[in-house]
């Protein structure tokens, strides 16, 4: 394969085996597990005693996670058996992988120690430094600042990019290292470069979109997400591969849909949602059962768009038409649909420009049903977790032959419950806070909104965000109805920190200025909104209203 990157580790093998190994390694760094495994398998066929080839195969299989874990362990065991033939550096790569596999409770200290030895032995080994960076990284704190291990990861990757500025893997990992923190703009240079280093890889072409989305350059992000769709569809068509073996395809489209929404391109977002619905696979990797956003699309493909804009009538219509069947395989999806129905009913009851006309009783009733459903689900999950713990203890007593049986991948598995409950708990807090605003209890409402924002942060960084509509926007809309203009401005600004340059937040700020009677501020705000949404759906009421207030000269530029 060509156009997949430029990674290399010198191994003790023939030139042909080396070429297959490097192909597998580049694909591994592209997160292209399916093709990476195929390349390493070919290397193993040609050189069955190549320990590093087995090492690579184990890494590729590991990336496919649980359903392939038995095979990954066998490949790693074979690498360990052959490590004495792998050379001094190859032996350390294999030992580091073995240490990682044997680690308990995410303790990577043994692996890190071996990788440090490898880097010390050969400071110019780019791959060793990249693997060390991956091992030491431990993410960001609640304020978006890097933890100590993450600081070291960043420093290592910076040094690698200084020494090898066009290394495809280093630029890929640099984007991942920087995007969750407070300074995603530090990866803009890599975002501009990466796709040219691996133009065949759908994921590598997609990655620039992560950074451009984070910095609020949604138009540029759209370009890369669209290019990734083309790359993946060309690959699947030419190689007769299904979406189940190209996980990036679904991931990229989910991100593309989220990105279109932030630009006000709702018609395109809906059209791409329809395309995605027909393109999903049948396994957990392409159904994204751990992503709350993806599970919403399994109920109804256009549901995330309706939730993003707060079109509660459309949300309720889609939920009422959902056909999720019966039985255990859709239990969590049915729970999600029921909870979203109560949430939408409550939010609809609260939505009125005249706060005195709000149907508080209906909103309270919906909130109570939602909370009762969450309580029952949490209790059921606790019971399931207890049963799983018992099963694990029983499994520990089974014989080795039983443990090594190849696992069967579930077809059309249910959604994971935990991410759903986290997001629904946030929605519950929002709904309860909205009721308090309608009752005039603003101080109590602010506390609940603050709690909801904390919980939104705790969900963690995801690509795209699991929580579809930022808490700040719902808070601002409620406070605006209560004529708490200062509170609404602060809430919209908080939302814009999460989604920079999003037209939803910018429109909200302009609307506050208008309701305050600040005509000049409103015109300026609506102009900023129209600048951010130059290609938004012309039929959107926000666009029409902004143009009417901002002036004819702004309308003429559209």
Regions found by a protein language model. Name each.
Residues 30-31, 64, 102-105, 139, ...:
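Structural motif corresponding to the intra-repeat A-B loop/turn of tetratricopeptide repeats
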Residues 16, 49-51, 125-127, 166-168, ...:
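Residue-level recognition of tetratricopeptide repeat
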Residues 13-42, 94, 98-105, 430-431, ...:
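Alpha-helical segment of the N-proximal tetratricopeptide repeat
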Residues 51, 58, 62-84, 213, ...:
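TPR/TPR-like (Sel1-like) alpha-helical repeat modules
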Residues 27, 61, 99, 136, ...:
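Residue at a conserved register position within TPR or TPR-like alpha-solenoid repeats
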Residues 45, 80-81, 120, 162, ...:
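Amphipathic alpha-helical segments of tetratricopeptide repeats
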